């Protein structure tokens, strides 16, 4: 949904303006820097049940350091989204930004003025610093959208989207690892199929037909090699 929204906004702004620029940013070490006091104030503004607040307080402050929430905790996803909802409201309602998309700790803003985006960036940085006690990653950039916008593993243009090169390399590395483990008999086929289905599901939303076919061909090769090995074992050839 996030990538679709970026595509929608890119098409909309392209029709509206001759030149479009993108502010792309993400929060530095987000989960590790969520402030417990700020998080609890946000919960207290939305939840009135004292028992629920007590439990949330215990969970959030479980490490005792005052900042950071455990990534694997069931409540962490909710807490992380709720925390940056404060940023969403600030950007949309206080700054009146129309073309804004956030997914977890990554966000983009589209505008036809670089100067306006730099000014918005300064406002966002100040809000994050003083209200949420966060800061942006140094990778923050403002650039023309004709370069394509990297978001959620895709590089997105108004007309199409591609898988990022990093995403493709990661998938290929994982497939090589699975191949070795499967042929060695240390990994079951169901796990590989689940992973492959997830990758293909992600890739199909980009212009990746050839890449997906290559993945399926590679998977078929792995199965054939493993089956031949099993036949040899059964025949006493190994």
Regions found by a protein language model. Give the residues of each.
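Active-site beta-loop-alpha junctions of metal-dependent nucleic acid enzymes
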Residues: 1-2
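Conserved polymerase palm-domain catalytic core
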Residues: 5-104, 108-126, 137-143
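Short, low-complexity, polar/charged sequence segments that are solvent-exposed and flexible
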Residues: 41-45, 128-130, 155-156, 171-173
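Short polybasic/polar patches that bind polyanions
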Residues: 93, 130, 150
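Short, well-ordered loop/turn and helix-capping segments at boundaries between secondary-structure elements
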Residues: 113, 130, 157-161
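Right-hand nucleic-acid polymerase module
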Residues: 118-119, 136-238
């Amino acid at each position: 949904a996030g990538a679709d929204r970026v595509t929608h906004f890119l098409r909309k702004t392209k029709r509206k303006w001759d030149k479009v620029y993108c502010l792309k940013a993400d929060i530095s070490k987000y989960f590790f820097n969520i402030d417990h006091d700020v998080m609890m104030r946000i919960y207290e503004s939305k939840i009135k049940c004292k028992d629920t607040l007590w439990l949330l307080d215990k969970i959030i402050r479980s490490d005792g350091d005052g900042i950071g929430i455990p990534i694997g905790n069931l409540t962490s996803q909710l807490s992380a989204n709720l925390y940056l909802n404060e940023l969403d409201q600030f950007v949309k309602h206080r700054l009146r930004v129309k073309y804004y998309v956030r997914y977890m700790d990554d966000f983009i803003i589209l505008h036809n003025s670089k100067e306006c985006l730099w000014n918005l960036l300064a406002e966002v940085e100040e809000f994050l610093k003083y209200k949420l006690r966060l800061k942006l990653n140094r990778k923050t950039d403002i650039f023309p959208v004709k370069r394509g916008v990297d978001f959620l593993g895709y590089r997105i243009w108004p007309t199409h989207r591609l898988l990022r090169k990093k995403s493709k390399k990661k998938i290929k590395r994982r497939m090589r690892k699975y191949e070795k483990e499967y042929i060695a008999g240390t990994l079951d086929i169901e796990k590989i199929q689940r992973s492959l289905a997830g990758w293909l599901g992600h890739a199909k939303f980009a212009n990746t037909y050839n890449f997906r076919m290559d993945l399926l061909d590679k998977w078929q090769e792995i199965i054939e090699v493993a089956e031949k090995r099993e036949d040899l074992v059964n025949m006493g050839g190994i």
